[in-house]
Amino acid sequence: MSQTTDRLWGARFKSGPSAALAALSRCPERYFRLTPYDLAGSKAHAGELQRAGLLDEQETRTMIEALDGIGADFAAGRIAPTLDDEDVHTFIERLLTERLGALGGKLRAGRSRNDQTANDLRLFLRDHVRTLAVEVLALQTALVDQAEQHVESICPGFTHLQQAQPIVFAHHLLAHAQSMLRDVQRLMDWDARTSLSPLGAAAMAGSAIARQPQQSAKEMGYAGVCENSIDAVASRDHVAEFLFIASMLGINISRLAEEFCLWSSRQFRWVDLDDAYATGSSIMPQKKNPDIAELARGKAGRLIGNLTGLLSTLKSLPLSYNRDLSEDKNGVLDSVDTLLLVLPAMAGMVATMTVNVEELRRQAPLGFTLATEVADWLAVRGVPFKEAHEITGALVQACEKHDLELWEASPALLAEIDPRLTADVRDSLTLEAAIAARSGWGGTAPQQVREQIGRLKTALAAQQQWTENYQGFRL
């Protein structure tokens, strides 16, 4: 083959590309991770060529066997792209023609790199959103397992990072699990929207050969085919949406990680990290650092950067395909890899932590966290809440002045603040009473928390089933 036609696009050129163009144009090494997905699309396209009459049954069988052989050799590390392989598609066509001769060159008919690359990334993402979901479910399971052990472990709840009201520790852990439940729901919703094959769009106008791509779409596990050939090759909103979901997941992980940095500090002393999930200092022998939490917190910014990078690339691109779109894979591969590093480490840290229940309880009433109980006690006895709030504020001021806790206020002090404050109010000023009072749906009362755990387990089981019931291509 001549120098001008080594590449898939070289036929109309009198000379090959400059070294600078070749270096810029060649896809990064990491993009060749899409090879198995390109092979899956190629096998489906071979069937479409047979249906179109360009391949007979034996040729199709030979083609698919060769593609399977390339896949096996690639997975085993027996073959690798060369510097002359401009991209995944060139790499596979070179190997196919080396093994099959002229027959290998037939596979290109009826398709373009434009619909191929769009298909490769969709297949990669549909596979990996399930892998990611499994890891998120493992982290959620660790949170739920810890929550089950601490349904009655009372701790302070916070607003503005100030102690606010007593809650059970399980309730706090489950709040993180609930946010991640939505992360997986977003992956599931995304997958339903993305389950459309772009094959058959060819360069942008549609294929004059592969005119019935519904069967190949079904073989690849898609629910259907993209409605518009231009949209199929030009749009990457599904990629940006995935990167948003990855960013939101990273942010939710980062919030949990931030709390572990606080909880494991000497100032909080809420949790002790297992030695296998903490590090030390090169100069301070006493240190036990929450590096997993800190690294997870830091990588959230990386995930957000991948999203904003792609959004900036997509801005103002005219229809249809533009080479700018080749940047779509950078953020995807990095975000997937980042999350697959962070999630197992976070799950292990959560699963192995030791909770200091006594310290949680000691801190629970500090900062007058039971003050709302006084206001509620007055309100249910007919005092307008505006007045109840003011009366309770005056009681807090008096207790601060006399260095008392709320439940230590004498009947005389209570009456001095307001005659409607009788000694009976002190029955409400226990941690157990405050917790038990929050017995409405979604509240922190232990029975409500147990019911929440049951519902959450049911939801997690359904999400786990979704990860397993996939008919598309998976590595």
Curated annotation (Swiss-Prot):
Q: Which InterPro entries match?
A: Arg_succ_lyase_C, Argininosuccinate_lyase, Fumarase/histidase_N, Fumarate_lyase_CS, Fumarate_lyase_fam, Fumarate_lyase_N, L-Aspartase-like
> What GO MF annotations does this protein's record show?
argininosuccinate lyase activity
For this protein, the record's Pfam families field holds:
ASL_C2, Lyase_1
Q: What is the protein's given name?
A: Argininosuccinate lyase 1
SUPFAM superfamilies linked to this entry: L-aspartase-like
- Family note: Belongs to the lyase 1 family. Argininosuccinate lyase subfamily.
Leader sequence residues: none
Q: Where in the cell is it found?
A: Cytoplasm
The pathway this protein participates in, as annotated, is: Amino-acid biosynthesis; L-arginine biosynthesis; L-arginine from L-ornithine and carbamoyl phosphate: step 3/3
Q: Which residues, by range, are in coiled-coil regions?
A: none
Q: What PROSITE patterns does its record include?
A: FUMARATE_LYASES
